[in-house]
Amino acid sequence: MTRVRRGYIARRRRTKIRLFASTFRGAHSRLTRTATQQKMRALVSIYRDRGRQKREFRRLWIARINAATHENGVSYSRLINDLYKRQLLLNRKIPAQIARYNLNSLYMISNEIIKEKRD
């Protein structure tokens, strides 16, 4: 029986795995089997942490807005509720950025809402 030369498909698959794992440390970037395992583990972590990142950023934005509005005597929930009642559709990222970089603007927004509510 004559010897059959192998094709390139397995080599191409391993090359793709090696390129993905090239920044891993130690044997995780050099050995095919461990690189494959670490690639699967990395993809699981990436998928899981995308959802986790959304939750953590939302918590951070709420904490920033709450800290800024409490200095003005308004609670976070009151501010968000009044924004929705006035149909000002701001997500939590925008007021958090305003609270971080331009606190007076957030004070003006909350005072305007409070003033209209009293009238």
Curated annotation (Swiss-Prot):
One cellular component term from this protein's GO annotations in UniProt: chloroplast
Keywords: Chloroplast, Plastid, Ribonucleoprotein, Ribosomal protein, RNA-binding, rRNA-binding
Name of the protein described by the UniProt record: Large ribosomal subunit protein bL20c
PANTHER family documented for this protein: 39S RIBOSOMAL PROTEIN L20
Cited function: Binds directly to 23S ribosomal RNA and is necessary for the in vitro assembly process of the 50S ribosomal subunit. It is not involved in the protein synthesizing functions of that subunit.
Principal place of residence: plastid
A GO biological process held by the record: ribosomal large subunit assembly
One Pfam family recorded for the sequence: Ribosomal_L20
Gene3D superfamilies: 6.10.160.10, Ribosomal protein L20
Similarity comment: family membership: Belongs to the bacterial ribosomal protein bL20 family.
GO molecular function: rRNA binding; structural constituent of ribosome
Location relative to the cell: Plastid, Chloroplast
Domain of life: Eukaryota
